UniProtKB/Swiss-Prot annotation:
Keywords: Ribonucleoprotein, Ribosomal protein, RNA-binding, rRNA-binding
One of the GO BP terms on file: translation
Species annotation: Stutzerimonas stutzeri (strain A1501)
Protein name per its UniProtKB record: Small ribosomal subunit protein uS15
Subunit structure: Part of the 30S ribosomal subunit. Forms a bridge to the 50S subunit in the 70S ribosome, contacting the 23S rRNA.
Record has Transferase as a keyword: no
């Protein structure tokens, strides 16, 4: 269910702020969003997988916290990221 190394590298390259950047809020939120989307597809086929649902909820909460941090820090970067990822906030 996890992202492959190639998928992670592609996401990091797309959302990085500088060379070697893997920890900026934009990269972290993009990686979490990709994982969340994969898990949502998993739950369409496996509706009773409650153990993995707990992990999904944890990822959604972590993404929300990072987005709240970014919104308080720099609203233009926040708005740009929301638009690029297609999140509704």
């Amino acid at each position: 269910m996890a992202l492959s190394v190639e998928e992670k590298a592609q996401i990091v390259n797309e959302y990085k702020q500088a060379e070697g950047d893997t920890g900026s809020p934009e990269v972290q939120v993009a990686l979490l969003t990709a994982n969340i989307n994969k898990l949502q597809d998993h739950f369409k086929a496996n509706g009773k997988d409650h153990h993995s649902r707990r992990g999904l909820i944890r990822m959604v909460n972590q993404r929300r916290k990072l987005l709240d941090y970014l919104k308080g820090k720099d609203t233009t970067r926040y708005s740009a990221l929301i638009g690029r990822l297609g999140l509704r906030r």
